Amino acid sequence: MNKQKLGQFIFISCLLLVSCVGFAQNLTIQGSLKDSIANRALNSATVSLVYAKDSSLVSFSRTNEAGAFNFKNVAPGNYLISVSYVGYVPKWVPVITGTEKTVEMGLIYMNDVNTMSTVTVTARRPPVVINGDSVEFNSENFKTAPNAVVEDLLKKMPGMEVDKSGGITVNGKKVTKVFVNGKEFFTGDPVMATKNLPADAVDKIQVYDRKSDQAMFTGIDDGSEETAINLKLKKDRNKSTFGKLNGGAGTPSVFDLQGNVNVINNDEQLSAIGGANNTNRQNFSNRNIINFSGGGGGRPGAGGGVTVNFSGGSGETDANAQGIAETFSIGGNYSNIFNDKKTEFNANLSISDVERNNISSSFTQNLTPGNAFNRISNANSIAGNKQQNFGSTIDHKVNDNFSFRFTPSLGFQQTTNYSEDSTQTYLTNGNLLNSNTTVSSSASDAVNAASTLLLRKKFAKKGRTISSTITQSFNRSNSTGNQFTEQLSYINNKLSNDSILDQQNTRKGENSSYSANLIYTEPLGKKSLLEFNTYLSKSIGSSSRRIFDRNNATDNYDLLNTRLTNEFNSEYTYSGGGMSYRSNQKKYNFSTGFSLQKAVLDGENISAKTKLSQSFQDILPNATFRYNFSQTKNLNVDYRTSTNQPSITQLQPVLDQSNINRQSIGNPDLKRSYVHNLNIRFFSSKILAGKSFFSTLNASTTNNSIVNYDSVLPNRTILTRPVNVDGAYRINGSVNYGFGIKKLKSRLSFGLNAGLNNNISYANGLLNTIVTKSTGPSMSYAYIVDDVIDINLTARYSFSQTSNEVNPTLNTNFLTKVFGADMTNYLPLNIVLNQSFNYAINTGRAEGFNTAIPIWNASFSKFFLKNKRAEIKMSAFDLLNKNIGINRNVSQNQIVDRSYNVISQYFMLTFTYSLQKSGLGGGARPGGMIIRM
């Protein structure tokens, strides 16, 4: 049995094994709810079934119009039933099952709080409370492992899914914001909260649809909303200090150190983190601020194609990352609310130092008509990246009608790079055409300062508002570097020429930008309004690139290469205004409007002593429509238009040969691109049944799309130049359906995505159409038994077909299959065993790049000391030692298959100690956090 069949056999066997669990459950518990005074049935009340021994949730449902409920396929045992209804006192009823197949609970009467003289508040609360489209889960009914984080708790919630990167979906809808006690945690990154806060610190998880800031400001629903989660902390954690210290080391020479502390004093929160590792764990996202373009405009398109990145692995270590990184980072976040709750303040600081070692090899098939060739490349590089970033937000409410928000930021960056690259180019008959060896180095630094001021004013009349946003930014970048290239040229495999390129370069870029807008809304009745807006934006930049050739006489780089040297000043100005109409009805809301935009570019090429001036005027219409079939079923249609202006780099007719194999030159005749985009989304869910259906359709077309015009020079160097084309469009769609299987304590999800991209480009002077069709079905299965076992199975297929009109030899078909299995066993003696298996298979690539990659990771944890504060873990990454990195890129004239180094097999022993001190005392379990990104 080969590796591919073995992996598929293991995956299917696991699925069948799990599917056989739990079929012995055959009891039914049923009853009905009524008002104790009016004797009327209570429709849509929440009924939860929990285990009597520990209150962990078994299932939950809602009553029908007759007030009836039932739970099917329940195992014999002792239970409690919780019933809750808005305006009524919650109630708990014990259930003891025997040998009967149906347990009749009869009538359960509930008391209206308004008819009672006194209400006794008990410590036991309902596991689930539903109010409209919001759901509240009580954490005490969901069991997690010792020292679990919020992410582990969310995985236990009905209808919630958490992917390996930490992304959260609730019944198919992506969660975009996570709040802690109503405030965003650590600059609003939801992953920071769910991956780091301890699960036992959370009292309630509240899930709701959050309206847009503009809708909350005007009071008129604009149809824009996002799914949000609020984590309400336990009372004793509102005044507490908690954190975690983690140290791990292993073979071969791997280490992972992390530490953090959180201090919460009601509204005041302070978090500090630090870490160092060489396992490709990145604690902060990279924010590249280096910019030599002088500002303005967009970036060149590649002329169409598809890119597939492919490697095995899963878990905290980034197995897919190219290269091996050694990372050091520290950071902090402070937030507080003061001045009688009128002022919210947040500040954060992050410092990181990353050094990445990259080793790669590639095989390029360039199939340009009349100039086809193959190229083999090998490259080694060491790249360093240091960043220091500070950000802050001050949100002040002057009174009920006027507020402002000020957001300053400051960032610094320093980079170094050293690379060695060797390339051999062969004709299609196998003869060697040339061989290049390049050694290059560079050092760069940059500073970026920005600020935004938002002013908001409400008037007495509801819906009448005025707001303004003023922004400012400044960027300065500097770089110096050296490049040495030796090119050996051959004729009939015999050396014909040996040329040397030995240069030093300096680059400088500076950009200042300012913008302001003004928005006024005027209500039309109670459910509609008109919005008027105007804006002005200006960007002033300068760009300098000076190239010096080596002077053999002086052995210095003092010969200015005027052909490659360029200095340019530019000024971009955007201005315009528009209006829109919004209406919010009971079942639907819609908006329609337009804006007028004028863009003016003035540029001066100091080196060539030439000037450039361009001006564009556009009308940009937009429209949105939302229809609510019910609180959990809706249809959204969104139409937008936008423009992309050419960048200064794209407009300058100056040669850039920093890449000896692919050189570029700008085009001063470029026009702006005009984009039409249509997005349709349908969503339906049944929260209690755990069912969700979600589908999307996105279509876009671009006029004057900016693509690359590639020409092949006699030595097979590619010269690329941006040009405008029409006819580019793309259509993408997806369907997802998920449902819970209460009998198996499981959830099953299916997905399908498909796409059609029609790209226009030029293949060595010939207008070319590249059509890419793609489709990909997927499936996931989750099986969870509290304190016993968690199992997650996934399968994903991805098929892509590319056709090339001018050059059919570039037509490609390739298939990627990925199977995954994750299992966590909670064993006696406070032992936890975790395993993950990923099996990735790809076909349709160049020889040597069709691989099957099985990745098996495992860990063994033991918790000890009082309250399980300490953990010792033995973990193994890539037990089979099979991890590799592969990348395929299909563009307008070539196919590039590339392999690169990735993190390989290692074994690590880790010790973790949790810190926790509660200001109010109490018996809460100690918690902690370990920063995971």
Where are these regions (language model features)?
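Short, acidic Ser/Thr/Gly-rich low-complexity loop/linker segments typical of extracellular
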Residues: 52-68
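Conserved C-terminal beta-signal and adjacent last beta-strands/turns
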Residues: 778-796, 811-933
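Short, ordered, surface-exposed loop/turn motifs in non-cytosolic proteins
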Residues: 37-51, 130
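Outer membrane beta-barrel strand-and-loop segments of large Gram-negative receptors
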Residues: 378, 513-515, 559-566, 665, ...
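Surface-exposed extracellular loop regions of Gram-negative outer-membrane beta-barrel proteins
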Residues: 223-245, 354-380, 384-397, 401-428, ...
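A short, solvent-exposed loop/turn motif at the edges and junctions
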Residues: 51-56, 78-94
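Membrane-proximal, glycine/serine-rich, low-complexity loop/turn segments characteristic
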Residues: 25, 66-68, 89, 96, ...
